[in-house]
Regions:
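Alpha-helical ds-nucleic-acid-binding substructure associated with the helix-hairpin-helix region
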Residues: 44-108
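C-terminal accessory module of base-excision DNA glycosylases/AP lyases that mediates lesion recognition
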Residues: 1-22, 82-92, 99, 106, ...
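Generic hydrophobic/packing signal
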Residues: 26, 30-33, 78, 85, ...
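Short, surface-exposed loop/turn motifs that are enriched in glycine and acidic residues
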Residues: 31, 35, 74-81, 124-125
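Structure-specific DNA junction-binding interface
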Residues: 1-73
Length: 193
């Protein structure tokens, strides 16, 4: 089993299906947690995978036993148990190589931020902005005369508006970087790992 630490490397290093499945599980875990905590929780859940399994085939086996996933999640103290359990049960049916934004958003507990975080970091030249507190703080630091939301917008129209503004600002501030690289630079500056 390979362990990943997405606090030290760009997730765009996800080179195969295995790594993308692992990263999507991490993306679900990181909602509401620090990247360091989510990295550890993902590892604690995934460390028992056999070398011939992918994260999703492993989870499918765990899910077959009615309460086993719930027991594992509680054992590793991941929190948000109902949301995460339902989300994991939904995502194992996705093809991480081809899933779309709409496919991800159709999964329980996967919102705009998580879906875009996954796609931005696993698709070459993806045009998304992850409106987490780091990007929003960064925007506010750049635009002292504009009021930027403190939290991720929940309405589709507001998310689309601020995503457009964030993409424009990221491209202007980091013209030589992909949006994923620019997002990682902002995260390194504003995150409490």
């Amino acid at each position: 089993m390979r362990k990943f630490d997405f606090t030290k490397q760009l997730p765009t290093h996800c080179s195969d299906k295995y790594e993308k499945e692992y990263f999507l599980i991490f993306a679900i875990f990181v909602a509401g947690k620090s990247a360091k905590v989510a990295t550890e929780k993902t590892w604690e859940l995934m460390k028992w995978i056999r070398h011939d399994e992918t994260p999703f085939t492993y989870l499918k086996e765990v899910i077959k036993d009615d309460d086993l996933l719930s027991v594992y999640l509680k054992r590793i103290k991941v929190g948000q148990y109902a949301r995460i359990e339902k989300a994991l049960k939904d995502i194992v049916n996705l093809n991480v190589e081809t899933c779309t934004l709409d496919d991800l958003l159709a999964c329980y507990g996967v919102g705009n931020k998580t879906a875009r975080f996954f796609l931005l970091n696993t698709r070459k030249d993806a045009e998304y902005a992850v409106l987490d507190t780091h990007i929003l703080k960064w925007l506010q630091s750049m635009w002292t005369l504009r009021v930027v939301p403190k939290f991720t917008p929940t309405s589709e129209s507001l998310y689309a508006l601020w995503e457009y503004e964030a993409i424009k600002a990221l491209k202007k501030e980091y013209p030589e970087k992909t949006l994923a690289e620019a997002d990682f630079e902002v995260w390194k500056t504003f995150a409490k790992v």
